[in-house]
Amino acid sequence: MDFSYSSYEKLISLLKQYNYSITDYNNYKKYEKSVILRHDIDFSIKDSYKFSLFEESLGIKSNYFVLLSTGFYNPMEKRVRKILRDMHNRGFTIGLHFDTTAYDNTDLNKPIQSEKHILEEILEAPVNLIAFHRPAPTVLANNLKFPGLINVYSKEFFHDCKYCSDSRFFWRDNPYELITSQKYDRLQILTHAFCWAESDRCPAHVYKSFISQASWERYKYLTENIRNPEEFISEEEARKLWLNK
């Protein structure tokens, strides 16, 4: 299975063909066979927003998890807030993607509740889901519970459901085969919109393009925040930096 939109569309078609109901973490038990589609926003809000529009064109809704402590995007930025609210208003579920390594304290509940509150302020809506970012084995083993939040790495969703992920452009289980095998009535499929595009791409190229794009985005933000930026750097110079020329 590659990382093209057409491959994802085939995934959705197979799920429907084999009678899986596409649902969420609150309602999956209502169905004889159910699948939860999850997306962790590790790198790019834009890619995730584009992917949500693609999913909407397929007639489905899924679950997106926002990483507040990332250095790659700012959930508080006006444009990002607008995107997240739009996704929520269009029926996509937004949850908290929490990085345990961002905090020194062993009691995680306080920073988790703080980030939950921030995300609720951004969305202007309640948040009741948490997915850990690159969870340590101890986090997975302890079946952690937090007030007001469903831990999607709890035993209920990580062991009782068949879990499948595309982490680092690599499927540890082929999702097509999981579906067609008919061995599992409960699936949780994690994908990262950053990996997906209209056509399949070399992972190294994706990461290099992502790094290169950052220089152009910095220039655009610069033009919005200082007067006469061309006194220091022209658009042509910025474009050359972006294109690595």
Model feature map: region roles:
Residues 93:
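Short HxH-centered metal-ligating active-site micro-motif
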